[in-house]
Amino acid sequence: MAATARHYDTILSPVITEKTTLLSEQNKVVFKVANDATKDEIAAAVEELFKVKVTKVNTIVTKGKTKRFRGIVGRRNDVKKAIVTLAEGQSIDITTGL
């Protein structure tokens, strides 16, 4: 199956923090994904875009913060993150080019 536009719309960006760098030692990679993406869609997109085997996908929805600007209450958007576990011996180097 070839990579489609939906695969590119599913995976938005990698999440690069100290915690995700430590997770990379356990064959796990963290991505910011579309809010309507399912675990199966995320696994298919990662397998197709990065040519790796995915064994497990865990998702987290972080609720947007409430912010005030000049007395007007607003809210930031919710963010969905996916922790993707890769098969043994496989890796994705997302820190290249930083």
Curated annotation (Swiss-Prot):
Q: Per the database entry, which stretches of residues form a coiled coil? A: none
Organism superkingdom: Bacteria
A single GO cellular-component term from the record reads: ribosome
What are the alphabetically sorted keywords of the record?
Ribonucleoprotein, Ribosomal protein, RNA-binding, rRNA-binding
Q: Where is the signal peptide?
A: none
Q: Which PROSITE patterns match?
A: RIBOSOMAL_L23
Picking any one GO biological process from the record gives:
translation
A GO term, aspect molecular function: rRNA binding
**InterPro entries to which the protein is assigned, alphabetical:** Nucleotide-bd_a/b_plait_sf (IPR012677), Ribosomal_uL23-like (IPR013025), Ribosomal_uL23/eL15/eS24_sf (IPR012678), Ribosomal_uL23_CS (IPR001014)
One Pfam entry for this protein is: Ribosomal_L23
Q: Which family does it belong to?
A: Belongs to the universal ribosomal protein uL23 family.
User: What is the documented function of this protein?
Assistant: One of the early assembly proteins it binds 23S rRNA. One of the proteins that surrounds the polypeptide exit tunnel on the outside of the ribosome. Forms the main docking site for trigger factor binding to the ribosome.
Listed under subunit, the entry gives: Part of the 50S ribosomal subunit. Contacts protein L29, and trigger factor when it is bound to the ribosome.
Q: Write the protein's name.
A: Large ribosomal subunit protein uL23
Instruction: Give the species.
Output: Caulobacter vibrioides (strain NA1000 / CB15N)
Tell me the lineage of the source organism: Bacteria, Pseudomonadati, Pseudomonadota, Alphaproteobacteria, Caulobacterales
